[in-house]
Amino acid sequence: MKIDFRSDTVTKPSKEMLDFMFQAEVGDDVYGEDPTVFALEKFASEYFGKEAALFCTSGTQSNQIGLQLNLRPGGEVICHADSHIYRYEGGGIAKNSGASVKLLDGNYGRLNVNQVKSAINPDDIHLPLTQLVSLEDTANKGGGAVYEFNDIKEISSFCRSVNLNISLIIISCA
């Protein structure tokens, strides 16, 4: 079987996967009638120690929901200039969240705490309010480079100290 890791949009299921899907018990998840979705969401919420989980059909859908939860219209997200949420999601940040983007260059897709500190807009009515820092641990434009754990902790600690939301998106497409 050929495995294609370029994107979740080009992956094709194997015969065994298709057979399993055709045998799966399904129902309407809106009415709580899909035991498979319910079991997956329950497992994920318990695994991550969260109150609830939501099954999404794509990485883009997941990213856009996460962005909307952390941004308000007129706000701004700080991210790398080659980030997936900026380059490959059809303008979703502006379209879905009504927010703008501040793009930063970094080493293989990674930002550092000093870049984040200097990118935050001052309290000025003429500028969008910085609301989110989005990091990506990626095999995408970053060429497979991952953040050092201490770098994420440092950025996260800074963001908490200034009451700024932070997200870490894991991207596995080429």
Where are these regions (language model features)?
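Active-site-proximal loop->helix
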Residues: 88-100
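Conserved PLP-anchoring active-site segment centered on the Schiff-base-forming lysine
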Residues: 69-87
